[in-house]
């Protein structure tokens, strides 16, 4: 829950007047600064009166609502399952490679003999 939801649009917090700090076993009293850009140590939080919705919240707010009686209990469309995907990798054995290379060599030598 945000601060603006509890206390309203504007919240002002005032730090304590005196603070104590111990340095090397000695107690030192510190006072808030009276100058600077914060106006004397006062913190002001301003909240937007109309905050902007983020992605999914905005989508859920603006999407069409089911108002028709037949549409209220309707589920998502059912499609037939997709066919299985082909394998990305196929295993090729070295014996098949040797047979392919020897057959291609003999066929190429036969082609050379025919052309000569």
Curated annotation (Swiss-Prot):
Highest taxon above the source species: Eukaryota
Subunit structure: Component of the chloroplast large ribosomal subunit (LSU). Mature 70S chloroplast ribosomes of higher plants consist of a small (30S) and a large (50S) subunit. The 30S small subunit contains 1 molecule of ribosomal RNA (16S rRNA) and 24 different proteins. The 50S large subunit contains 3 rRNA molecules (23S, 5S and 4.5S rRNA) and 33 different proteins.
GO annotation (BP), single: translation
Protein name as catalogued: Large ribosomal subunit protein cL38
Residue interval of the organelle targeting sequence: 1-47
Family: Belongs to the chloroplast-specific ribosomal protein cL38 family.
Region called Disordered, residue ranges: 95-116
Subcellular location: Plastid, Chloroplast
This protein's GO CC annotations: chloroplast; ribonucleoprotein complex; ribosome
Record key words, sorted: Chloroplast, Plastid, Ribonucleoprotein, Ribosomal protein, RNA-binding, Transit peptide
InterPro entries linked to this entry: Ribosomal_cL38
Entry annotated with the keyword Glycosyltransferase: no
